[in-house]
A protein has these predicted regions:
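Soluble non-cytosolic domains of exported or imported proteins
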Residues: 45, 131-132, 272, 276, ...
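Short beta-alpha junctions and helix-cap segments that line functional grooves
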Residues: 244, 491-495, 559-561
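Solvent-exposed, polar/charged alpha-helical surfaces in well-ordered, non-transmembrane soluble domains
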Residues: 280-286, 458-466, 470-474, 496, ...
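Active-site histidine-acidic residue metal-binding/catalytic motifs
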Residues: 418-505, 515-518, 522-524
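Solvent-exposed loop/turn segments at secondary-structure junctions
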Residues: 423, 443-445, 485-489, 511-516, ...
Length: 616
């Protein structure tokens, strides 16, 4: 369900909520000492943490006996260092006192001292893995210095050698605080070694006889099970042996299993966990050979990984491949569909450029002699090339810089690429013919960030979104709202609303906070986030426009893999209007007059951006 607005609708709750926020700010002097983040017993791996809270503006607030800085309204957000283990912080305001306990956990495994033992959870592979014959498999363990470490796998014994010190990379969120440089790690005493597996193994594929049809077909191919590795450690004359948790098998190259994508858009990644980057989603029905496994993750023959939960195995299927001969066009209202007739639904990828869209088909060989290329509203020319024996690349050269969204799907074995046309102005108002989706972030139990007085991000997001909606409607736009009340809505549901409603642009409205090691006292400003190339110009333009017109500090423009920036069906941008965590900026965020200025400026920026894109 979503909410569609194309005429002015009075919002009763907006005025009341603004009064509540005003009342909160006005009555700050009557409030007691409060710390809203972190809660006591918080655990973090950060080397420092900020504290968000407030107290009456008269008087002073101390943390562990040290006076801290506060805003004119009495809010504070100091950052303090953390030691490994338990850290206690005592907050004092006049005769009031709060104790907050924060535990810092280490990033590296704890090394046993002076005893023959492996560090807990340090043996790798930690999950069951499967590899092709002749591939390299590496083993590692953390053990005390001067240990003699080896691993036995089947009839092989592999020595594990101590490794030189390597730097640690911080979490991806460190890019949001500017503290993303490598961290010098203390010596972890990691022992590693590698070997090849299955080079001299032979595979037999058993046959299955169907008693009804009397036909004989290949059954499930036999895997070579090498079992779990045995790790051995010798120190000071004492030897221990520990069995690893991950079993190792070798896949049969004569009949690799074939997986079919069962989700609408299979999440392809660069490696076997959600820590790895996303690639172009695989359309439902895509078929691809499995060349490796890591736990629940499948390595696919074109190089990507996918969680097995998004696939099903097709028994007895041979490795999918196809030839391609022709390409067809279907011109529809507001969009063009390009049809690629294939023999099998193969993996694909898409890369957008400034005036191009490049589609790659894997496991595909061209037998193309001719295809039709009439004039098209958005495409100036289609080029193609066989970039390697199993990979065909199609380059759509476009007439204008701005792209308005695309979708991929399979109809049977034919791939359909849908490319959307630019909006057509159908009235006198500046945004006539434009549909804008507004997504007020969070909602329901998902409250988002919190201000020092307990103001919740979800509420402010909704207030601002309603104001933007009303301004957009006055300019002639049709507006879709993912929510218009305090309800919980999953990220997947929000994405589906974008894909189903096909807005001209989609904006997700948020207010910011920081990772634990951020400088909440000083970091503030307006920021925008984009993922697909088609959204970059909109993100950059709105950022620059709002920062200049409102004289707000710039937090920056970020490429970011966020659920509400990923939809490719429309240019999708996430806006962070300010920092709930900043003790000064929060006063602007909750001020009704500043809320109206922000909403109107964002709307003005949208109008100016459409004026600009229509010219080029």
């Amino acid at each position: 369900m979503f909410y569609l607005f194309n005429g002015v609708k009075p919002v009763l709750g907006l005025f009341l909520f603004s009064l509540i926020l005003t009342s909160q700010a006005a009555n700050a002097t009557e409030q007691s000492l409060k710390v809203v983040y972190p809660r006591t017993n918080h655990k973090t791996s950060a080397d420092r943490i900020f504290f968000i809270g407030t107290a009456p503006s008269t008087g002073q607030v101390f943390i562990n006996g040290k006076l801290i800085q506060r805003s004119s309204a009495g809010h504070f957000a100091p950052s303090l260092p953390l030691q490994i283990g338990e850290n206690n912080f005592t907050f004092r305001y006049q005769n009031q006192e709060l104790l907050i306990k924060v535990t810092r956990v280490g990033l590296q495994p704890e090394i046993p001292q002076g005893v023959a033992a492996f560090a807990p959870n340090s043996l790798t592979p930690a999950v069951d893995i499967a590899r092709l014959p002749g591939e390299t498999v590496c083993f590692s363990a953390v053990a005390p210095p001067s240990s003699n470490v080896s691993v036995k796998l089947g009839n092989q014994t592999v020595s594990l050698s101590p490794q030189p010190q390597t730097a640690l990379l911080p979490d991806n969120k460190a890019a949001l605080t500017g503290r993303n440089q490598p961290i010098t790690a203390s010596s972890s005493h990691t022992y590693s070694g590698c070997t090849t597996v299955g080079s001299n193994l032979s595979f037999k594929t058993p046959l299955y006889r169907n008693n009804i049809s009397n036909t004989v077909t290949p059954d499930t191919p036999t895997l070579i099970d090498l079992g779990k590795p045995e790790f051995q450690l010798t120190l000071n004359g004492k030897t221990i042996t520990t069995t690893g948790t991950g079993k190792i098998t070798v896949l049969p190259t004569n009949q690799l299993q074939v997986a079919e994508v069962t989700s609408d858009a299979g999440v392809a990644r660069t490696g076997p966990s959600t820590d790895f980057s996303r690639l172009t989603p695989l359309p439902k029905g895509t078929r691809v050979s499995i060349t490796g496994r890591d736990g629940d993750w499948l390595r696919l023959d074109y190089g990507a990984w996918i969680n097995g939960k998004e696939t099903r195995i097709i028994p007895g299927a041979v490795a999918p491949s196809t030839i391609i001969r022709s390409v067809g066009y279907r011109n529809l209202p507001g969009k063009t569909e390009i049809v690629f007739p294939l023999q099998a639904p193969v993996p694909v990828s898409v890369v957008q450029g400034d005036k191009s869209l490049v589609l790659t088909l894997y496991n595909t060989t061209a037998q193309t002699d001719t295809f039709r290329t009439d004039d098209n509203p958005i495409i100036s020319r289609l080029d193609w090339q066989q970039v390697n024996p199993n990979q065909v690349q199609y380059t759509f050269n476009l007439k204008k810089n701005q792209q308005w969204g695309y979708k991929l799907r399979y109809e049977g074995t034919s791939l359909i690429l849908t490319m959307r046309h630019p909006p057509i102005k159908n009235g006198r108002k500046p945004l006539s013919g434009v549909k804008v989706l507004l997504d007020p972030g969070h909602g329901g139990a998902e409250s988002g960030a919190s201000g020092p007085e307990g103001t919740l991000e979800k509420d402010v997001n909704l207030v601002i979104s309603r104001l933007i909606r009303d301004d957009l409607i006055k300019r002639g736009a049709t507006v879709v709202m993912t929510r218009d009340s305090d309800v919980e809505l999953s990220l997947v549901d929000r994405q589906k609303i974008i894909d189903n409603s096909e807005p001209t642009i989609a904006l997700s409205i948020h207010h910011n906070s920081l990772p634990d090691n951020g400088d909440a006292e000083n970091i503030k400003g307006f920021g925008t986030f984009w993922y697909n190339t088609q959204a970059h110009d909109l993100a950059l333009f709105l950022h620059n426009y709002v920062v200049k017109k409102l004289n707000r500090p710039s937090y920056g423009v970020f490429w970011n893999n966020l659920a509400l920036t990923r939809p490719a069906s429309s240019p999708s941008v996430l806006l962070e209007l300010g920092f709930m965590s900043n003790p000064n900026e929060i006063q602007l965020i909750v001020d009704p007059s500043d809320q109206k200025k922000m909403a109107q400026t964002i709307t003005d920026g949208i109008v100016e951006w459409f004026n600009k894109t229509r010219k080029y």
